[in-house]
Amino acid sequence: MWHSAFRTAVIPSVDSDTRLYRAGVRLDHVVIAVSDFERSNAFYRVVFGAEVVAIDGRVAYRVGEQQLNVHGPGTRPAMLARIPVAPGNSDLCFEWPGAIEEAVEHLRARGIRVEAGPMTRGGAKGPGTSVYFRDPDGTLLELISYAS
């Protein structure tokens, strides 16, 4: 199958201009959808320490240097994906700065059920150890630790 290569190798870019890579192109934000702003604001603050910010009449969660733009009841985004995101249909992974056992304890102390893991998974920095859980709308969330 064509996609088996993605499991074993990095596919080089066909673009010979590598300035973008040297400049450190990074993901700026992603969009999630929620069904209840209050409930989701509380969840992302408690679990991730998110700062809830208003941007042009919309809500975003800032988690470290990452930003989640939030679509929800009453919002009318100017730009939408061809198939807009809906509550519960996203899958996001955040890097945990310590041992994965600390992440599990962090979640359990906040009454959040770990759905799967710890298990070895591949992430942006290579192999790591992950746990999976869900936000109140069912969005799949993953914490990955690269700590040895």
Predicted regions and their residues:
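Conserved active-site tyrosine of GNAT-family acetyltransferases
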Residues: 40-45, 107, 138
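Vicinal oxygen chelate
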Residues: 15-28, 50-134, 146-148
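Short phosphate-engaging motifs
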Residues: 39-40, 99
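Short glycine-/small-residue motifs
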Residues: 142-143
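Conserved beta-strand-loop-alpha-helix junction that forms the acyl-donor binding cleft
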Residues: 34-36
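Acidic, Ala/Val/Gly-enriched low-complexity intrinsically disordered segments
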Residues: 5, 9-10, 14-17
